[in-house]
Structure formats: structure tokens, C-alpha cells
Regions:
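Jelly-roll (double-stranded beta-helix
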Residues: 1-75, 79-165
Length: 165
């Protein structure tokens, strides 16, 4: 699956820490993802975005906010477990609270993030279904998050080096 918005691949991806409960940690633990379920028909992951983090709690500008995108084949469902999920779907913004969900069919542009004003961590289950080429599974989520986390760490290293010159 080619994702042009990712740019050139970094040469050394940051290896995530994996907790005893199976959570993969990115951005120093500010973002966690868990495998919930999956088969030929669907994939569901649990994702936790830490409030107050520049990577996961800075609103739409957070490092871990997915770019505005759409899926050719998949229907994506966001089911909020706790916290507040903010979203933009086809240019319209809104929020979801715990117990609420939204279903996004193919070809609908969207992104989502942890709503800053809630001041709480966002815990969301994300399910992707459908298409002849699902292409969205646990391996994709891990690779995408490793890529974002590595790029963020590289930027911080460059900024640190520049401040010392």
C-alpha cells in the first residue's frame, strides 16, 4: 500500500516498547495501540491518546493526528470508550463523547484527534471493514505509528543540535 503523504522512509525506525498487556507504545508512551480483533472481514484496534502531549494532545496539530485522507474500499468506525474525539469528515468538524460512534464509508475524507478542551486521554476503538484489498491491519497501524514516531524524534534531535550551535 503506497502512502505518498508519508514521504521518504526513515532509515532507522524507532522500535516501540511493548507492554505486558500487549500495548504498543509510541511517542514515549503518549500513544498506545492494542489489537482487539481481526479476521478477513475486519480489523479493530484500541488506541489511547494522552492528553497534554504535543504528540497526542495538541488537537488537530498533534504529531499522531492522521493526515486528512479517505479509503478506497474500507468503511471505518470510531467508537469512543472515554475522552472526547474530535473529527473532520468532508470538511465538517464535530466531536464524539464516550459511548458515541461514527461510521465513515469509502471516499469520505476524514481525520480525527484528541479534543484538547476535554483535558482527558482519548480511548477509542477503530474498526475497518470491507474491500477486496483491506490493507489496514495491525501491521499497518504499527508501521504507520513507527514512521510518525521516528520522524518526530528526528525533528527533536535536529532542533536540539541546532540550538547548540
Amino acid at each position: 500500500m503506497a502512502l505518498s503523504f508519508l514521504g521518504a522512509a526513515p532509515t532507522n525506525l524507532t522500535r516501540p516498547k511493548i507492554d505486558a498487556d500487549g500495548a504498543w507504545n509510541f511517542f514515549g508512551g503518549d500513544f498506545k495501540t492494542f489489537f482487539i480483533s481481526g479476521d478477513k472481514e475486519h480489523f479493530t484496534s484500541r488506541q489511547i491518546f494522552k492528553a497534554g502531549s504535543p504528540h497526542t494532545g495538541a488537537g488537530r496539530g498533534s504529531t499522531a493526528t492522521p493526515p486528512y485522507h479517505y479509503h478506497l474500499y474500507q468503511t471505518e468506525t470510531f467508537a469512543v470508550q472515554s475522552g472526547t474525539l474530535a473529527y473532520c469528515i468532508d470538511g465538517k468538524e464535530g466531536t464524539l463523547a464516550a459511548g458515541e460512534s461514527v461510521v465513515i464509508p469509502p471516499y469520505r475524507h476524514h481525520t480525527f484527534w484528541n479534543e484538547v478542551s476535554s483535558g482527558t486521554d482519548l480511548d477509542v476503538h477503530i474498526t475497518v471493514r470491507g474491500g477486496d484489498n483491506p490493507g489496514f491491519d495491525e501491521a499497518f497501524v504499527h508501521a504507520f505509528c513507527k514512521h510518525l514516531s521516528t520522524r518526530a524524534e528526528s525533528c527533536l534531535l535536529i532542533l536540539d543540535l541546532c540550538s547548540k550551535t
